[in-house]
């Protein structure tokens, strides 16, 4: 008998299943749609030689790569924004802050928005802390580091480490962070996302 376990990050992370189930489980990570999967979900006819891939890619980048987005897109962008807002509220503002008992939600949200506005840039907890301090908000770099870990373990962001080709080893600082879905930039950055096209493409 197969048993499928899903749930809120506020109560259980997939990494804890190994302890609770004593290794008798298989973890399947489900990612948002790739561009090809997105087109398939929209039932696009690939045999059409006049297919406007540029317009379709624009939709993919500017809406959302989450599966539900293809179901509700005919209802308009407002519906997609409502859906993304609900995702953000549930996962970031509720699940993570509740699970880790984060009291300073303003500071946490500022870090999320800072990371979103700097996707594809080399970052460290220390320079994030310094930048926020210059903007009038003091957050210790160790707190920033914890918040980054929470966002990664909840699959909101992915971290890519730098690699020293000469020494053939990963470097411990100045990592890059990418959003699981660039559609979340609609919520986190609004119209400002337009100026970040290069990093958005890098994220994809």
Regions found by a protein language model. Give the residues of each.
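Loop/turn-to-beta-strand initiation segments
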Residues: 1-4
């Amino acid at each position: 008998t197969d048993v499928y376990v899903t749930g809120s990050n506020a109560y259980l992370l997939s990494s804890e299943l190994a302890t609770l189930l004593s290794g008798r489980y298989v973890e399947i990570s489900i990612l948002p749609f790739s561009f090809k999967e997105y087109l398939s979900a929209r039932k696009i006819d690939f045999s059409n030689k006049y297919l406007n891939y540029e317009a379709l890619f624009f939709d993919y980048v500017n809406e959302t790569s989450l599966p539900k987005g293809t179901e509700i897109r005919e209802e308009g962008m407002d519906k997609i924004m409502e859906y993304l807002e609900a995702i953000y509220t549930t996962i970031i503002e509720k699940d993570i802050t509740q699970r880790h008992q984060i009291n300073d939600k303003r500071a946490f949200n500022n870090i999320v928005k800072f990371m979103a506005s700097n996707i594809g840039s080399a970052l460290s907890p220390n320079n994030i802390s310094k930048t926020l301090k210059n903007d009038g908000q003091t957050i210790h770099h160790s707190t920033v580091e914890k918040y980054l870990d929470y966002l990664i373990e909840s699959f909101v962001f992915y971290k890519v480490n730098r690699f020293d080709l000469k020494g053939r080893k990963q470097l411990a600082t100045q990592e890059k962070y990418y959003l699981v879905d660039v559609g979340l930039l609609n919520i986190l950055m609004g119209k400002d996302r337009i100026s970040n096209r290069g990093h958005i493409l890098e994220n994809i």
